[in-house]
Structures are given as structure tokens and as C-alpha cells.
Amino acid sequence: MKLSCGFLLIFLVLSAMIATFSEVEATVKCGGCNRKCCPGGCRSGKCINGKCQCYGRSDLNEEFENYQ
């Protein structure tokens, strides 16, 4: 009985550690998309499917004026 309780306790601790590590890994991979993928020309970025996606260039109006 003690052996099965010990095994169950170790299993629960390991599963909690793996779950925590997975969350941290996902946060680091996607965290700070605004800084990573849009250093100078984007308004914002989002994490979509584990990748940073940039959109909404802030310098678009300036480029349009130069084009005309």
C-alpha cells in the first residue's frame, strides 16, 4: 500500500512539473510579439498557433504620402 501511494505521489509531482514546464515554454516562445516581430514598423503583434504574427504598420500613412 505504501509503495503504491508513493508511486502515485511521484507521478502527480512529475505530471505537475511537466505541465508547468509546458506552460512556461509556450509563454517564452510567444511572449513579447510586439517587441520581437515589429521592432519599428508595426502597431502590434499576436501569438497565433505558437508564432508571432504582425499587423497594422504604423508608418503606412507616411509611405503613402511619399508615394503621392
From Swiss-Prot:
Q: Where in the cell is it found?
A: Secreted
Q: Which GO terms describe its cellular component?
A: extracellular region
Where does it mainly reside? secreted
Molecular-function GO term, any one: potassium channel regulator activity
Write out the propeptide range(s). Answer: 56-68
- Can you quote the domain comment? The presence of a 'disulfide through disulfide knot' structurally defines this protein as a knottin. Is completely devoid of the classical secondary structure elements (alpha-helix and/or beta-strand).
Family listed: Belongs to the short scorpion toxin superfamily. Potassium channel inhibitor family. Epsilon-KTx 01 subfamily.
Name of the protein this chain belongs to:
Peptide TsPep3
